Amino acid sequence: MIEAAIGRGVYGMIITDHDNVMGGLVGKKAARKYRNFRVIPGAEISSQSGHILAIGIETDVPKRLSVEETVERIHDLGGIAIASHPFSRRVRPSLREECLKTDGIEVFNATNRGLANVQAVSLARTNGRPATAGSDSHWVRTVGKAGIICDDPLNDIRRGQTRLFGTYASLWRMRVFNFRQLASALVNRPIWK
């Protein structure tokens, strides 16, 4: 993934695997061999209401906590908390209100479609919340599709001093990925049990 990012002109990435920091820590270590490339570890925490990006942490945060408690744990670890894709279909509507307890809102997600990103932009602007963007990459071909441009990611996000960029991930590639996820879930956890 690092080589794909470099190939697309990206000079750093925030790696946030679901509910654990391991991928980010491995990526941070792997990035040492590349000059002028930085990996910031984190996790995409599954709170009771939806996903919260924990950026800049190196210790896991338990899942299924309230948004408020999730944010508190992230802050205790020195990280920042971003409401991830608050208007996607996978998120409970309560996150849309609770995301104002976070440090910022992901307003562009390369895998969202329809009004989800537009609604997130409106929520962030209306409430004066810092905005972020992300590829939400689950495979190498979407790395670098969206992100932030800044000098000091953690502090610049906190202050709302980032520029965003983004294009949508290919619908075809997303469908293939989602089909593979579904097939894997059915094999590993059959619905009839």
Positions of PLM-derived features:
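Short glycine/serine/threonine/alanine-rich loop segments
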Residues: V10, F37, G79, R129
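Divalent metal-dependent hydrolysis catalytic cores, especially in the metallo-beta-lactamase
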Residues: I2-D19, I80-I82
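Short, conserved beta-strand segments within well-ordered enzyme catalytic domains
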Residues: I14, R38-I40
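Charged catalytic cores and adjacent phosphate/nucleic-acid-binding surfaces used
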Residues: M1-A4, M22-A30, Y34, P41, ...
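Active-site flanking residues adjacent to catalytic metal/cofactor-binding acidic residues
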Residues: T16, A43, S84, S135
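Aromatic-lined carbohydrate-recognition surfaces of secreted/lumenal glycan-active proteins
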Residues: I82-R90
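Short beta-strand/loop segments at the ligand-binding rim of alpha/beta enzyme cores
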Residues: N36, I74-A83
